Amino acid sequence: MKVLHVVTGLAAGGAERQLHLLLRHLPDRHHCEVAVLTNPGTVAEALRADGFAVHELDMRGNRDLAVLPRLTRLIRTRRYHAVHTHLYRAGLYGRLAARLAGVRTVLATEHSLHPGMIEGRPAGRGVRALYLAAERLGRTTVAVSGQVADTLRDWGVPEHRVHLLPNGIDAAGYAVPAARRTAVRAELGLPAGAFTVGAVGRLVPGKRFAVLVEALAALAARPGGPETRLLLVGEGPERAALAAQAARAGVTAVFTGERDDVPELLAAMDVLAAPSTEETFGLTVLEGLAAGLPVLRTACPALDALGPDAAPGARRLPSTAEAYTEALDALRTAPPRRLPPPPAVHHYDIARIAAELADLYDRLGPARTAAPRPAALWA
């Protein structure tokens, strides 16, 4: 089956990196290409390096309707059997373009959905109504966690149209040699003995990285223990504010910007911290566990769905500076260690998740018809 994945952007966010990982592990019977509406970033480069075709559509803002005929032509010309969309804007334009091009095997993955939020933005009645209208153009909507599935149903998506398929992780990809850890730390300017607290994600308020700056400032005021560093992997609009906060607090913070070598950057850390309260899956937490790190986390539906023994190296905390300060203080005086990947990592093995997605494609089946009239799409 020939499948086009339509995604809003390809900066190095969790949904974008998950798409890349899925495509690398899908069975060969499915040939996949990618269309990106805007902002092709490091993930687009990585996809091309792996041999995947990436079609850039140069969308200029949320209401650039000119992208719709361009995407429709692409789908019709390259004769895809199925169209699979990722993220809100791609879901709106991608589903409609697929139907206009005569493709009926249309599905979407919902990566970031909360009761009143979608992808970190408020989802009022108008947004929800538009979402539901677009959702009707597809065959099914994939939820990456039970929390997302519940929200879809609460929004009005029928139960039979929701398919739960969690994110996956490639544990083998996080086994980084000790020598490489030393080299990466040197590249980042991290002193050999510095206790390095790391975090991965877009630099936006919802990730609550300011909590970590406060915690490290409080940690520095306590006697004993090694010097500390904060390593923030990601890019976003909060970068300047976080840098200013760190400077005022006397916290040495290293900002890597957008990177696609996350396993090596995790290897440079001594602990991964994830104080976000708004996660729909918690992929970064699983990545930290796969890398053998002790993990301090707040929201992680992926772990909450499993038993208490699924991730003994992860500790759940309130998203407060006080809680993270106490937990980090206990870790910084303990000997550095690498833990074996826990059962949770193996539960979300990417090979199994990709195989389930391939089976879903097979069940939906390639179906093409003549392009319907636009008015009929919304009936």
Regions found by a protein language model. Give the residues of each.
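Carbohydrate-associated surface elements
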Residues: 147, 168
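Aromatic "clamp/platform" in nucleotide-sugar-dependent glycosyltransferases that forms part
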Residues: 258, 277
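Nucleotide-sugar donor phosphate/pyrophosphate-binding loop at the beta->alpha transition
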Residues: 65-69, 104-107, 114-137, 150
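Conserved acidic donor-binding segment of nucleotide-sugar-dependent glycosyltransferases
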Residues: 309-322, 330-335
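A short helix/loop element that forms part of the nucleotide-sugar donor recognition site in Leloir-type
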Residues: 175-190, 336-342, 374
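Short hydrophobic beta-strand element within catalytic cores of glycosyltransferases
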Residues: 36, 294-298, 304
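Nucleotide-activated donor-binding/catalytic signature segment of Leloir-type glycosyltransferases, i.e.
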Residues: 243-257
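A conserved mid-protein helix/loop that constitutes part of the nucleotide-sugar donor-binding site
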Residues: 13-21, 195, 199-220, 237-243
